[in-house]
Design a protein with these regions (language model features):
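Alpha-helical, largely C-terminal catalytic domains
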Residues: 1-401
Length: 401
């Protein structure tokens, strides 16, 4: 996603900007679990429960169960052959377009001012976050729930673009400091009035920080305090993963495969997956969420979803001139094999992780109905995420190295 353009900071807040240190230059054991009665969100009334995960490839995309729920983009999607994934449950182009339109309106608000440039607004719509949340959260009870997920998604990408991508001013050696400030946009600092005012001015000075602050406010309006706290914790873990990646990039060091997979457990889509209950209009109680088995299922589903991104984005990353690593490249380095062979080995790793998730989810789903519903949400996210990536093949993604 292309980074937003920073708004000019008023001279009166320049000192606060300096204190904040933020500027535009900163840097298979049966089917997966299902909801007992199927999805209940917008556009899902005629949908059947999703079949088990399938290996996608020459067989093409799964057939929609309702003409009203399948946009034209689904039939033209291209998928990585042999990649094992649950199929998407709900794909609604009109609903995705509505979400995208509302996102542009939100991003243009004075307290966000994320994408003031026309080209960047078009890039936001081209990124298609609306379709992502429609695919990944088929049980969302309304548009505002989908918007809550979409705002967080856009804010997370703005933080990644600004603070982690060199082409947008990110710097590996300053990443930790700016990410701590980004965390404070959703996990407020508590200081004396004087320094709290400086902190607020610091947040106001940067579009990524403004967007995360606003997105979190909307999310808190529909989430419970425990769900909001869970999101803050998962974002902090994500930033820990960003820092691990930044350290390797700073050293130009390719980690071992096992180390990379450890990094991926933190530097993953986990914050997007673990809000599945809040976006679905219910709550998995904190005590159940903290159960080791649930945590394992969350980690596996998050890793699988992020490795899916590794695979689809490999060609784009290889074309860039910067030092970068992903599962295929670390396997190629460790096994001394071609990138094509490493790509196939990465598919196998992804598929094994999805199957491990399915096994864990099936076991957990028998323990509590809310756990079963949460496991279904994770499964929906894996399938929706894969479909969204496949929909961008030929534009930002590819099905081979």
């Amino acid at each position: 996603m292309q980074a937003p353009t920073s708004r000019t900071t008023d001279p009166a807040t320049a000192a606060a900007d300096s204190a904040a240190g933020v500027s535009a230059t900163a840097g298979s054991v049966g089917p997966p679990p299902r909801l007992p009665s199927g999805p209940t969100g917008l556009g899902t009334s005629s949908l059947r429960l999703a079949p088990p995960a399938v290996e996608t490839g020459e067989s093409g995309p799964p057939q929609p169960s309702s003409p009203s729920s399948s946009p034209s983009s689904s039939s033209s999607s291209q998928r990585i052959e042999g990649l094992y994934s649950p199929p998407p449950v709900r794909d609604d182009r009109a609903l995705a377009d509505e979400i995208n339109g509302r996102l542009v309106e939100w991003a243009e608000q004075d307290d966000v001012d994320l994408y003031p440039d026309v080209d960047l607004r078009e890039a936001l719509v081209g990124f298609d976050p609306g379709r992502s949340v429609v695919l990944c959260h088929p049980d969302a009870p309304g548009v505002e729930h989908l918007m809550a997920a979409a705002r967080l998604l856009v804010g997370e990408n703005a933080v990644d673009d600004y603070f982690c991508e060199a082409e947008y001013g990110g710097s590996a050696d300053r990443r930790g400091a700016v990410l701590a400030l980004a965390q404070s946009a959703i996990d407020p600092a508590h200081n004396t009035p004087r320094y709290e005012a400086d902190w607020r001015s610091g947040l106001d000075s940067h579009p990524a920080l403004r967007s995360m602050r606003s997105a979190m406010g909307h999310f808190r309006a529909l989430a419970t305090p425990a769900q909001a706290h869970r999101y803050r914790h998962d974002i902090a873990s994500l930033y820990l993963g960003y820092n691990a990646e930044g350290d390797c990039i700073h050293q130009h060091r390719t980690p071992a495969v096992w180390e990379y997979l450890v990094q991926r457990q933190f530097n993953s889509f986990r914050p997007c997956l673990t809000i599945t209950d809040a976006i679905g209009g219910y709550e998995l109680p904190a005590a159940l969420f903290a159960e080791p088995g649930v945590q394992r299922a969350v980690a596996l589903s998050s890793n699988a979803s992020t490795i899916c991104n590794d695979l689809y984005s490999l060609r784009k990353e290889q074309r860039s001139e910067r030092f970068h690593y992903s599962l295929p490249t670390v396997i190629a380095a460790e096994d001394d094999c071609s990138i094509e062979d490493a790509f196939q080995k990465s598919i196998e790793v992804h598929n094994d992780i999805v199957r491990l998730f399915e096994e864990q989810a099936a076991e957990l789903s028998a323990t509590h109905p809310l756990v079963a519903r949460f496991m279904t949400g994770l499964s929906n996210w894996i399938g929706g995420n894969h479909e969204w990536h496949a929909g961008h093949v030929g534009k930002r993604y590819a099905t081979s190295p």
